[in-house]
Amino acid sequence: MPDRALPLVLYVEDDRIHLILMEEVFRLLPGWELRLAETGAEALAALAERRTAVVLVDMNLPDMTGLELRRRVSADAGLSAALQGVRWIALSADDPGALVRAAREAGFDDYWLKPIDVPQLQSGLQRLLD
């Protein structure tokens, strides 16, 4: 039986501490591969380079918002087609308020409040791929 590639999660976050913590969390989550991007531009490059299963996006990046990143992907016909079926999760420590609706309208599948604990992340990721 051929080896199957692990589902890839792209985590887009500009806070170095959060990046390090997420790397540690994914060491505890077998069955997943993690890739990191610190800016929207890095995320766009990563998405164009390799098939991704889930994109976790902080809403406040240094070069664009998470909403803008999602909209840019949707506006690029080739990239959007290549990413058909990818699950998008908006992440923020801010009170969601109207941002949840804006995230859904931009194409996000869900909105998770930070900080995210390990069981929440694990069950959320599994639910997305079921």
Identify the residue ranges that each predicted region occupies:
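Acidic, metal-coordinating helix/loop segments flanking the phosphotransfer/catalytic sites
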Residues: L36-V54
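Two-component/phosphorelay signaling modules centered on CheY-like receiver
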Residues: R16-R35
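As written
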Residues: A103-D109
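Conserved acidic carboxylate
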Residues: E13
